[in-house]
Curated annotation (Swiss-Prot):
Bifunctional enzyme with both catalase and broad-spectrum peroxidase activity. May play a role in the intracellular survival of mycobacteria. The gene is katG1. Its EC number is 1.11.1.21. There is a cross-link at W116-Y244 (Tryptophyl-tyrosyl-methioninium (Trp-Tyr) (with M-270)). This is Catalase-peroxidase 1. Homodimer or homotetramer. The active site is at H117. It catalyses: H2O2 + AH2 = A + 2 H2O; 2 H2O2 = O2 + 2 H2O. There is a cross-link at Y244-M270 (Tryptophyl-tyrosyl-methioninium (Tyr-Met) (with W-116)).
Length: 752
């Protein structure tokens, strides 16, 4: 091997004559992409595309779950012999199947890619994607061009799933396979947790506005400058149908420095910093190979477009045998190391041990080959050895001014790479699972900062007598019903059901960055939080038997007490269910940058939107309800109740359709549906509507789209009518309380 060279700046190739195929794609740069076809008959959404789609609040209905409403995965998992499962996985790793032969005598590389591509869809801006629900089994992810051949990987797992049945979910099995694959190669992983529950139909996620695979124009606003462009939110990939980036470079232009720009942005949107990103690429490419021995036009349609007789398998290949050495997965033909089945530092030794020149794979895809190199790379099926090769994105790890110093350090200190990759891999596989309280199994390591850790309960909890006394103190504290309700909502409404982050547990409303979020009205928190802290301190100092109440619990209890009072003021007696057990996190255990992405752009429940945001308010309201795991009726009754309670952001009166603000009632619905009121856009205020008496023209109310959507949208109006009925006044109160408790407890996974 030639001696290490200090620089690889010549790895940036000339840009002339390097245009790739217009249909080029990662893990499939030469396979023609499918063309979406108009369907018939048209749906309501096709006819009225601007109408808010409430149906997204009712995805994954229990009726579609063959295991039924009573199935408890955590309980079923306890019956699993995890060591036996691991042993069977290790045996499978080296048990070649004639219908899909293993490379180098192992499926490790294939399983690592499967797990990575399942987890790698996660994105931080909205918490969508990830491996937590086994979504790789369904469209569109199962047919993305980046996932060619992963249908075979999942099919290889079927005998394992069939054997262990309900004790292991597909979501867990897909991820566990990659972890075991690394261990089979001699790598010591950081840990592993089970606990992912399967979904039973595709998720409705906006992966991009482009209508063809590999499109990039919509997410970048049409710019062609690959070194100075900004990916639109919330997308996590540069290209439609890819997990991260095109390995040939942006839009198939083989420029390692431009590729590094894309890598940094996309991995950052998966919550990975530069060192974690470099570790994942270096470690992930230490094992296995890519597949591109022939032209991509010999590869058939993806699973969702494949004929019925292929039984869910796609990409049938007509090149040679179509499998083994004739497998076409990416069009790229790269083996990174001399030890593709064993963990080693060979990747970095080869990356820095040669100069690299641009070439084309047998599948006509851009890649790099080592200059003046001997054929030292083993063939996966016993053929002649090969020269070292790398992807465009591999060269990025050397020439980029940030990644370069990191990987050079690891070249000299491989033990640092081992630790960095172990932790980054663990984070990749578990980032979307939420708090560690959701984790199952015997291999769970100590909590990490990115898991938003909260302390364990280390004291006796308050009982019913304590709760009653604390409610009295809260109502006598000088804080209004509105202050108590708004503080509790601010704490709990940070929750995201997508990646199970946020919520009231941890009491992080008092910490940065949440304390200064505009939506939380920091000046109001400065009034409310010190009062609540004093009540908690006084109780904890005087309570017997070591009982304590956390500020997180007291904030929620304050909301409960306020709602009970508001219901009494409206003529109804209710009890708001409360279960203590939350604890208070510290600022040092709160990653400010990580929490920043949880800050809402809008919260229609508080009639708040960031100034200048042009998105339709009613769409943002439904999105917020989706994050809070709410149904359409729950969203409806919460908005109506919160308006009656007069808890809008900044004290706004928009939507407060009642003569008795602060009392819990169904007045919002009664007055919204009153046909003696005529609504028109305000001539003086943006995004505001005025409700005028049809006879006199006098202004009765003001509202935003967050309010009027419940009279405009036919689905939501149907629900609003129920709550406006004379015989459903009490039902409205009861349903509001139930929905409120659901929001307060969204992050109480210990109660499940």
């Amino acid at each position: 091997m030639p001696p290490n060279t200090p620089d690889a700046s010549d790895a940036r190739p000339p840009q002339a004559d390097t245009e790739t195929h217009s249909h080029s794609e990662s893990e499939n740069p030469v396979i023609e992409s499918p063309k979406p076809k108009a369907h018939a008959p048209l749906t309501n959404q096709d006819w009225w595309p601007d109408q808010v789609d409430v149906s997204r609040l009712h995805k994954q209905p229990i009726e579609g779950n063959p295991l039924g409403a009573g199935f408890n995965y955590a309980e079923e998992f306890q019956k699993l012999d995890v060591e036996a499962l691991r042993a069977d996985m290790l045996e499978l790793m080296t048990s070649s199947q004639d219908w899909w032969p293993r490379d180098y005598g192992t499926y490790a590389g294939l399983f690592i890619r499967m797990s990575w591509h399942a987890a790698g869809t996660y994105r931080i801006f909205d918490g969508r994607g990830g491996a937590g629900q086994g979504a790789q089994r369904f469209a569109p992810i199962n047919s993305w061009p980046d996932n060619v051949s992963l249908d075979k990987a999942r099919r290889l797992l079927w005998p394992i799933k069939q054997k262990y049945g309900n004790k292991i979910s597909w979501a867990d099995l897909i991820i566990f396979a990659g972890n075991v694959a690394l261990e089979s190669a001699g790598f010591k992983t950081f840990g592993f947790a089970f606990g992912r529950q399967d979904i039973w139909e595709p998720e409705e996620i906006l992966w991009g506005q482009e209508d063809t695979w590999l499109g990039t124009d919509k997410r970048y606003g049409g710019t062609n400058d690959s070194t100075n462009r900004e990916l639109a939110n919330p997308y996590g990939a540069t290209t439609m149908g890819l997990i991260y980036v095109n390995p040939e470079g942006p839009e198939g232009k083989p420029d390692p420095l431009a590729a590094a720009h894309d890598i940094r942005e996309t991995f950052g949107r998966m919550a990975m910093n530069d060192e974690e990103t470099a570790a994942l690429i270096v470690g992930g490419h230490t094992l296995g190979k890519t597949h591109g021995p022939g032209p991509g036009d010999l590869v058939g349609p993806e699973p969702e477009a494949a004929p019925i007789e292929q039984q869910g398998l796609g990409w049938k290949c007509a090149f040679g045998s179509g499998k083994g050495s004739d497998t076409i997965t990416s069009g790229l033909e790269v083996v990174w190391t001399t030890t593709p089945t064993k963990w080693s530092n060979s990747y970095l030794e080869i990356l820095y041990g040669y100069e690299w020149e641009l070439t084309k794979s047998p599948g006509d895809a851009w890649q790099f080959e080592a200059k003046d190199a001997e054929a030292i790379i083993p063939d996966p099926f016993g053929g002649p050895p090969r020269k070292p090769t790398m992807l465009v994105t591999d060269i990025s790890m050397r020439v980029d001014p940030i990644y370069g110093p990191i990987t050079r350090r690891w070249l000299e200190h491989p033990e640092e790479l081992n630790e960095a990759f172990a932790k980054a891999w663990y984070k990749l596989l578990h980032r979307d699972m939420g708090p560690i309280s959701r984790y199952l199994g015997p291999w769970i390591p100590e909590p990490q900062l990115w898991q938003d850790p909260v302390p364990d309960v280390d004291h006796p909890l308050v009982d019913e007598q304590d709760i009653a006394a604390l409610k009295e103190k809260l109502l006598d504290s000088g804080l209004s019903v509105q202050q108590l309700v708004k503080t509790a909502w601010s704490a709990a409404a940070s929750f995201r059901g997508t990646d199970k982050r946020g919520g009231a547990n941890g009491g992080r409303l008092r910490l940065q960055p949440q304390r200064n979020w505009e939506v939380n009205e920091p000046s109001e928190l400065d009034k409310a939080l010190p009062v609540l802290e004093r009540i908690a301190q006084d109780f904890n100092a005087s309570a017997s038997d070591g009982k304590k109440i956390s500020l997180a619990d007291l904030i929620v209890l304050g909301g409960s007490a306020a709602i009970e009072k508001a219901a009494r003021d409206g003529g109804y007696e209710v009890k708001v269910h409360f279960v203590a057990g939350r604890t208070d996190a510290s600022q040092e255990n709160t990653d400010v940058d990580s929490f920043a992405v949880l800050e809402p752009r809008a919260d229609g429940f508080r009639n708040f939107v960031r100034p200048g945001d042009k998105a339709p308010l009613e769409q943002l309201l439904v999105d917020k309800a989706y994050f809070l795991n709410l149904t359409a009726p729950e969203m409806t009754v919460l908005v109506g109740g919160l308006r009656a309670l007069n808890t809008n952001h900044g004290g706004s009166k928009h939507g407060v359709f009642t003569a008795n603000p602060g009392a819990l009632s169904n007045d919002f619905f009664v007055n919204l549906l009153d046909m003696s009121t005529e609504w028109k856009p305000s001539e003086t205020a943006e995004n505001v509507y005025e409700g005028r008496d049809r006879r006199t023209g006098q202004t009765r109310w003001t509202a935003t789209a967050n309010d009027l959507v419940f009279g405009s949208n036919s689905v939501l109006r149907a629900v609003a009518e129920v709550y406006a009925q004379e015989d459903n006044k009490a039902k409205m109160i009861e349903d509001f309380v139930a929905a409120w408790v659901k929001v307060m407890n969204n992050d109480r996974f210990d109660l499940d």
